[in-house]
């Protein structure tokens, strides 16, 4: 009878540990999701914003360039900003995740 009491007492403790571990994994997953979402938004919107800022505010107002040259320069600026955003994402993915190691669970 004492074995049953020990097993039932340990099962409750194991369930609490499992729940705590699950909450920890959920927290890590949410943190990873926020990071990936941030970089996705950066990769999508930074080039668009860069293109229109360069075209509308910088190149048209301060330089006397033709419309085609303004569009080309704005597109080049957008491509450069895209490469910067991708480089930041790759750097973060490669070097930034040193603290979270994959742990095998049985």
UniProtKB/Swiss-Prot annotation:
A matching Pfam family: VMA21
InterPro entries: Vma21
Membrane association type: Multi-pass membrane protein
Subcellular compartments: Endoplasmic reticulum membrane; Endoplasmic reticulum-Golgi intermediate compartment membrane; Cytoplasmic vesicle, COPII-coated vesicle membrane
Stretches assigned to the Lumenal side: 54-69
Key word Glycosyltransferase present: no
Cytoplasmic side: 1-32, 91-106
Transmembrane segment boundaries: 33-53, 70-90
Domain of life: Eukaryota
Region (Disordered): 1-26
UniProt key word Endoplasmic reticulum: yes
Alphabetized UniProt keyword annotations: Cytoplasmic vesicle, Endoplasmic reticulum, Membrane, Transmembrane, Transmembrane helix
GO CC field: endoplasmic reticulum membrane; endoplasmic reticulum-Golgi intermediate compartment membrane; ER to Golgi transport vesicle membrane
GO aspect biological process, one term: vacuolar proton-transporting V-type ATPase complex assembly
Reported function: Required for the assembly of the V0 complex of the vacuolar ATPase (V-ATPase) in the endoplasmic reticulum.
Family named by the database record: Belongs to the VMA21 family.
Cited HAMAP family: VMA21 (MF_03058)
Name of the protein: Vacuolar ATPase assembly integral membrane protein VMA21 homolog
């Amino acid at each position: 009878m004492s074995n049953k009491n020990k097993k039932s007492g340990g099962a409750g403790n194991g369930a609490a540990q499992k729940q705590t571990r699950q909450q920890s994994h959920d927290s890590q997953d949410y943190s990873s999701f926020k990071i990936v979402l941030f970089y996705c938004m950066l990769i999508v919107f930074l080039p668009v914003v860069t293109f229109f800022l360069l075209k509308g505010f910088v190149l048209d107002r301060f330089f006397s360039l033709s419309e085609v040259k303004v569009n080309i320069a704005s597109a080049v600026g957008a491509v450069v900003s895209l490469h910067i955003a991708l480089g930041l994402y790759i750097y973060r993915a490669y070097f930034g995740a040193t603290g979270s190691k994959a742990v095998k669970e049985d």
